[in-house]
From Swiss-Prot:
Record's keyword terms, sorted: DNA-binding, Sigma factor, Transcription, Transcription regulation
Protein family according to the UniProt entry: Belongs to the sigma-70 factor family.
NCBIfam families associated with the record: sigma70-ECF
Induction: In the mid-exponential phase of growth under acidic conditions. Positively autoregulated, in the presence of RsoA. Down-regulated by YvrL under nonstress conditions.
Protein's name according to its UniProt entry: RNA polymerase sigma factor SigO
Taxonomic classification: Bacteria, Bacillati, Bacillota, Bacilli, Bacillales
PANTHER family, sorted: RNA POLYMERASE SIGMA FACTOR FLIA, SIGMA FACTOR F FLAGELLAR
Summary of the function given for this chain in its UniProt record: Sigma factors are initiation factors that promote the attachment of RNA polymerase to specific initiation sites and are then released. Together with its coactivator RsoA, positively regulates the expression of at least three operons, including oxdC-yvrL, sigO-rsoA and yvrJ. Required for the acid stress-dependent induction of the oxalate decarboxylase oxdC.
Quaternary structure and partners: Interacts with RNA polymerase.
Transcription regulation found in the keyword field: yes
Annotated region of DNA binding: 139-158
Residue span of motif Polymerase core binding: 30-43
GO function term, MF aspect, one: sigma factor activity
Length: 176
């Protein structure tokens, strides 16, 4: 019984009991009953498989239609007119440009306690955290730009986060 459909059929206790009865003491009635149950089970499996493939094919066709319509009828917001300047020449939006111009992580923090904790970090910790969280740089990219090892940058990053956690915990204890 290596066939997965047969295994699945026999996983039902009722089917297995009937199969066992037919194998131990074969009789025409039980054999026909087992055969009918298996035919019904197999028919259901085929219907489920058909429905599954139809759903998959329909979803692929739907995606194709949506992409075709988007290509055929693009939104006017996606393509600014010649006089409009919604995005820069590099293609980034205005918000990303604003973030790129801001090189201090503390300028992006709205929580005053977090702001104070960031202010107490070393310049190198601030720099690493800014590059990771504002610019999305990897540890390796930061290490290359600062001329240090990836492991050292990772340690600076961890220590910076640890210092922020300690500062916030100390501030919370002071409030209680």
């Amino acid at each position: 019984m290596k066939h997965p459909i047969v295994k699945h059929f026999l996983s039902n206790p009722q089917h297995y009991r009937l199969f066992k009865n037919v194998m131990e003491s074969p009789n025409e009635k039980d054999a026909r009953s087992l055969d009918e149950l298996f035919k019904q089970f197999y028919k259901e499996i085929r219907i489920v498989k058909y429905m599954n493939s139809m759903i998959r094919i329909f979803s692929i066709d739907f995606d194709k239609r949506v992409r075709k319509n988007q290509k055929r009828y693009p939104l006017t917001v996606d393509h600014p007119e010649a006089g409009d300047r919604l995005s820069s020449e590099t293609g980034s939006d205005a918000f990303e440009e604003f973030l790129d111009r801001q090189d201090d992580l503390s300028q992006h923090v709205q929580d005053y306690q977090l702001y104070q904790a960031i202010q107490k970090l070393t310049d190198k910790q601030k720099s690493v955290l800014t590059k990771v969280y504002l610019h999305g740089a990897t540890m390796q990219e930061i290490a290359d730009s600062l001329g240090e090892s990836r492991q050292n940058i990772s340690n600076i990053h961890k220590k910076g986060l640890e210092n922020i956690r300690k500062q916030l915990a100390a501030q919370k204890k002071g409030e209680k």
